[in-house]
Amino acid sequence: MKVFIPKLDQFVREDHPYRKILELVDFKELTQALQEEYSSRGRGGYPVDTGFKCLLLQYTEDLSDRELERFLQENLAGKLFCGFGLDETTPDFSYFSVLRKRIGTSHLADFFNPVRESLKEGGMIREIIT
């Protein structure tokens, strides 16, 4: 007997905004400097680009750490965006504060600004001066 395990990709519509962001932003390249600071020793954790995408969702969706934990458990588009599978465990709330400390709150803008520029170039956002 074969067990069919569906792919997360099947449950998120093709025109979802998170998919467009993934097309426009090279998160691996963006987080390369952070990756170099991670040790290759010890138990492996979540990939750096995955953690950064979680923080980006937290910012754009205006979520607390605990709300982000639940969002990633329940929201299929959020799981897809961050790179989690249907059956993968997502981080708990404490992971996000540790990651922010590791990056440094003042340096988050250094990573968010290139994302903003890519989204502007891709036509997803625009600046309105009033």
What spans do the regions from the language model cover?
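Alpha-helical support elements that line or immediately flank enzyme active sites
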Residues: 52-62
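Secondary-structure capping and boundary motifs in well-ordered enzyme cores
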Residues: 43-49, 88
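Charged, often Cys/His-bearing segments associated with DNA-binding zinc-finger transcription factors
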Residues: 1-25
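Active-site- or DNA-interface-adjacent structural scaffold in DNA-acting proteins
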Residues: 86-130
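DNA-recognition alpha helix
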Residues: 67-80
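Short, Lys/Arg-enriched N-terminal segment that forms or immediately precedes the first helix
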Residues: 29-43
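Short amphipathic alpha-helical surface patches that mediate protein-protein
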Residues: 39, 73-74, 116-117
